[in-house]
């Protein structure tokens, strides 16, 4: 059950990650009138957050929270960041936008290492590669499905804000599911 839940959440996490990196520049340019270079720089800030997040979240999971609670925290941060991104205004101070996008990147791009380590830990003994491959099927399905859904919602509502608001819903659902998931022991190997 834990591996299935992790796979489902990775599906949604990858939807958030790929939608963010696919549409952020266009959103900043089209909806907020940023120049392409400035919008690209802000995407770089998001990516830098992801680099730092991959390292920092591993430490947080190992030393303090455990993987499941860290992933629940990351889902909360994704939801809050997606909401803040949907509510961005052109008159906001640039440092505020940098901060929002840094946290968004740290959570939406930085989740993968904690997730993969937990999948390997939850796998039956000797089956980590099978569990990882199986769950990554769902992860990459989210990569394929997420951006077109985000784009369709944005087109239907005439703004990229709608897509970011949809990410709030998916991230919040994952946070709730992961928070309620009972920490489970490592599964024994099948006989």
For each feature predicted by the language model, list its residue ranges:
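Extracytoplasmic gate region of multi-pass secondary transporters
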Residues: 2-58, 112
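C-terminal transmembrane helical hairpin of 12-TM major facilitator-type secondary transporters
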Residues: 67-118
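Multi-pass alpha-helical transporter architecture, strongest
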Residues: 165-191
């Amino acid at each position: 059950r834990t591996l299935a839940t992790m796979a489902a959440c990775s599906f949604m996490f990858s939807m958030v990650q790929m939608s963010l990196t696919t549409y952020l520049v266009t959103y900043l340019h089209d909806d907020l009138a940023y120049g392409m270079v400035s919008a690209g720089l802000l995407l770089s800030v998001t990516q830098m957050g992801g680099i730092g997040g991959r390292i920092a979240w591993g430490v947080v999971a190992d030393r303090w929270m455990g993987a499941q609670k860290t992933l629940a925290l990351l889902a909360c941060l994704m939801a809050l960041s997606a909401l803040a991104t949907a509510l961005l205004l052109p008159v906001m101070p640039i440092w505020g936008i940098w901060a929002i996008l840094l946290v968004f990147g740290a959570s939406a791009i930085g989740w993968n290492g904690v997730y993969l380590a937990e999948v390997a830990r939850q796998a039956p003994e000797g089956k980590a590669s099978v569990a990882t491959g199986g769950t990554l099927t769902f992860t990459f399905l989210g990569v394929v499905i997420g951006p077109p859904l985000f784009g369709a919602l944005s087109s239907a509502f005439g703004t990229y804000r709608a897509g970011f608001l949809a990410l709030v819903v998916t991230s919040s659902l994952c946070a709730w599911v992961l928070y309620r998931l009972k920490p489970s022991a490592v599964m024994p190997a099948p006989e």
